[in-house]
């Protein structure tokens, strides 16, 4: 992995499972087992990414557990608890032209229908009912806002996504 590539986070290491170095895995993929479609993984430890390989995995109830190469006991596994699991962006499936990954929206300018710049997408929250764009307002926001939370509801609030221009057009009152 080159130094300018940042892995795409697809999960997180959970607590240990047993005494032989197995770990519970929290997957952010569509299906919990989908995280194992990607290899290698990169783990973020102490702010640094390092490559790891999954030796084996299995279902544990509705969840999954995994064993990583080089991790053979509970103590080693505990050191990895809460580490993010990343993959290289090029490992992800290519999408049709009119679709995108949430990560593609990070950094996009958000403009309302009147052309007011509401700020840039800082992150996206998954709330269960609908996802929410967290928009960091510009430093000199005329309405004194520092952040806006805009529900990602196409046709209702999110009218257009222009990825080539890194812009999202929304129907949103800048004072809200």
Swiss-Prot record:
Major location category of this protein = cytoplasm
| Superkingdom, natural source | Bacteria
InterPro entries under this entry? PRC-brl_dom, PRC_barrel-like_sf, RimM, RimM_N, RimM_N_sf, Transl_B-barrel_sf
Which keywords accompany this UniProt record? Chaperone, Cytoplasm, Ribosome biogenesis, rRNA processing
Query: Entry's NCBIfam families?
Result: 16S_RimM (TIGR02273)
**What subunit structure does UniProt give?**
Binds ribosomal protein uS19.
Q: Its function?
A: An accessory protein needed during the final step in the assembly of 30S ribosomal subunit, possibly for assembly of the head region. Essential for efficient processing of 16S rRNA. May be needed both before and after RbfA during the maturation of 16S rRNA. It has affinity for free ribosomal 30S subunits but not for 70S ribosomes.
What is recorded about the domains? The PRC barrel domain binds ribosomal protein uS19.
The protein's name:
Ribosome maturation factor RimM
